[in-house]
Amino acid sequence: MLSKKKKYKNNKHSDWNSLEIPLGKRTRKYRFFEILPGALSYTMFILLFVLSLLSPTIGSYYLLLIIAVTLVKAVGIVYRTVQGYNAAKRAEKVDWHKRLQELKNPHKNYERLMLAKSHEFEFDEHVENLKMLSVGKDLVVSEKDLDEYGKTFKVDFPEPDEIFHAVIMVAYNEGLDTLIPTVEAVKKSSFENKRIIFVFGYEERGGEEMAKNAKFLAEEYKDVFYKFIPVMHPKDLKDEIQGKGPNLDYAANELVKFVKKQHILFKNVVVTSLDSDNRMSKWYLDYVAYQFIVHPNRQHLSYQPVSLFTNNIWDAPAPMRIIAISNSFFNIISSMRSHTLKNFASHSQPLLALSEMGFWSKKTIVEDGHQYWRSLFFFHGDYEVLPIHVAIYQDAVMEETLLKTLKAQFIQLRRWDYGASDVAYVGVRLFSKDRKEKGRMSFLPLFAKFMRLLEGHVTLAAISPMV
């Protein structure tokens, strides 16, 4: 009896019981990991002065070590930047709509292209995908795996015409001059508009003007897409912070209601989240649909474009241009490091997967990066972010005056740095006693991800200013 009680007690307080970030009182272990990034960052600063006082030689070696590590990273950054830029440039030249349509008749198109030579981006991979679809399911490796009941997974490849895109654009108090170009970019996409469900999630806190904007957009685009759905996110809902995540989550729940009414299969709907200033490449939706079809494990994938902060780059003040270009370079580099790629800003994920895991977190400011960890833990490690090598263009920070612009830029960078909150979210699960039993995740792969997460935030906070 005692053992059963003990087992129940351990299960009750398991870190794996919920995907949500705890609010209010946290455990000592959780607080330790919350403190860890800041403590390490301060330690690196303080250590430089302490070592210099104890021994100038040791202090010099410590500083040289930091500079040497940074130099090695810089070489890798240059290489990945050039590689990523070339990939993005070549991918933008591909007619992804044509490639998607070629999946309708894979056997015929494989015979036509199997001996063809082309320098087009990922042309050989496209031919292999046609072969995979034309030969049949028996040769698909993932079909040979067994599920938890000892049966083979059913592998299917949906037809291009069966795919629906649901685009969720969220906004707070932005004007029509910002909102309309974003909707227009989706409208001008090479993907068929009548298979795009556009959801506009706006905040009640945005006031009467935002409600008018939503009404205008709904009327203006009512006949453009399969459906244009304005959704007002009520203010002051329980267990929510003020941020993008709750708005996105609320809009997604309304989307689910609509999809059910239309009898559209959840498994064939891909959801893309957009900020109000995002302008997607015309190929983006076709590119995502293509990758969605050719990957049998599609429900356990999300699709990450390259975010470039260049919409208003020549209007922004010089300091903001430098930061915007640096952030754009970082995203280009990330697209070439698929083993470390995480969700950032705009991204796409299957509706079926989102509905099963409870959509996005309503308790974190950085809902995009946090979504990676939610998905990873929900799928017990069987989750991956697939790079989409075309851009979604965003605004560089710009306000009415230089002082306001600098303040807004600081707030944006600070908001991104809140991603350090994921260190505790990941750490408590990594070092939990029931990680193997309930999380079904191996220690070393998760430890490597945890260390990269921790190192990234410590580097940003401590090493960058020191160098």
Regions found by a protein language model. Name each.
Residues Y62-I66, M169-V170, L341, L454:
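Hydrophobic alpha-helical transmembrane segments of multi-pass membrane proteins
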Residues L2-Y42, S52, A87-R90, S335-R337, ...:
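Basic/Trp-rich segment in TM-proximal cytosolic loops or flexible interdomain/linker regions
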Residues M1-V155:
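N-terminal membrane-anchoring/stem segments of glycan-assembly enzymes
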Residues K89-S421:
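Internal catalytic domains of large membrane-associated glycosyltransferases
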Residues V69, I229-M232, A448:
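General helical secondary-structure elements
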